[in-house]
Design a protein with these regions (language model features):
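A structural signal for short hydrophobic beta-strand segments in well-ordered beta-sheet cores
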Residues: 16, 134-136, 196
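Conserved alpha/beta core of the MobA/IspD/sugar-nucleotide pyrophosphorylase nucleotidyltransferase superfamily
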Residues: 153-219
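Short, high-confidence coil segments that cap the C-terminus of an alpha-helix
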Residues: 36, 81, 109-116, 192
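Residue-level detector of anion-binding/catalytic polar loops
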Residues: 38, 58, 191-195
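Short phosphate-binding loop-to-helix
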Residues: 40, 46-104
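Conserved core of the sugar-phosphate nucleotidyltransferase
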Residues: 95-174
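N-terminal glycine-rich phosphate-binding loop and ensuing alpha1 helix
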Residues: 1-43
Length: 219
């Protein structure tokens, strides 16, 4: 499930900006489709939905939502599945090979239903506030911050059970989530575990226009 909205505060309209000649949200969806799983874009924008239709990408229209995970939760009401992967629509460098690393780790969720898996990767410069850094000990993520607290960052993909998705959406936002503007802190603040899947990659999340230029130079 790929949540996408036009009203990004740092880069308005970025889902429809071009990556390698096609809209970024479509590029992300096509990467995800290469895993063989069913892929949907969930959005409150009819422009995004129309664009997805033109590329034969399945989409679900939702109301406005506070976070991408809240949007995925609403969209999943229409999908019969025990598990869900939330892939951010601004991660065009997350290839099917990298997504398959997350998928390979997902059987853990059959035995530990209170856990969420997120992608992580090493970074050389932790000073960029657009990158969400994470404190990783073993496979467990202990904290997320936009401050330079470690040399690992969170990558915009996470897997969980559908029941945990609903639980996540029902939990109140805590002070840490509000302060750091990192939604996965909600799970940690409420006493649950997040596991990091080291993708051992070098991806770029498109947060601002200059990121888009970097991504297109890499493709």
């Amino acid at each position: 499930m790929i949540p996408a909205r036009m009203a990004s505060t740092r880069f308005f309209g970025k889902p429809l900006e071009l990556v390698a000649g096609i809209p970024m949200v479509v590029y992300c969806a096509k990467n995800a489709e290469e895993t063989g799983l069913d892929v949907y874009v969930c959005t409150d924008s009819r422009d995004i939905q129309t664009t997805c239709d033109s590329y034969n990408i399945k989409s679900i229209l939702t109301p406005e939502c506070a976070t991408g995970t809240d949007r995925v939760n609403i969209a999943m009401n229409e999908i019969d599945s025990k598990f869900v992967i939330n892939l951010q629509g601004d991660e065009p460098l997350l290839t099917s090979k990298l997504l398959n690393k997350i998928i390979t780790m997902m059987p853990i969720l059959n035995h530990f239903d209170d856990k969420i898996i997120t992608g992580v990767e090493p970074i050389e410069d932790p000073s960029d506030i657009n990158d969400v850094k994470c404190v990783l000990i073993g496979h467990k993520v202990h904290y997320f911050s936009r401050h330079p607290i470690s040399n690992y960052k969170q990558v915009g993909v996470y897997a969980m059970s559908k029941s945990n998705l609903k639980k996540f959406a029902s939990l109140p936002q805590g002070e840490l989530e509000k302060r750091e503007k990192v939604e996965l802190l909600r799970w940690i603040e409420n006493g649950f575990d997040i596991l990091g899947c080291d993708l051992n990659s070098n991806t770029i999340s498109v947060d601002i226009p200059s990121d888009l230029k970097k991504v297109n130079l890499m493709l």
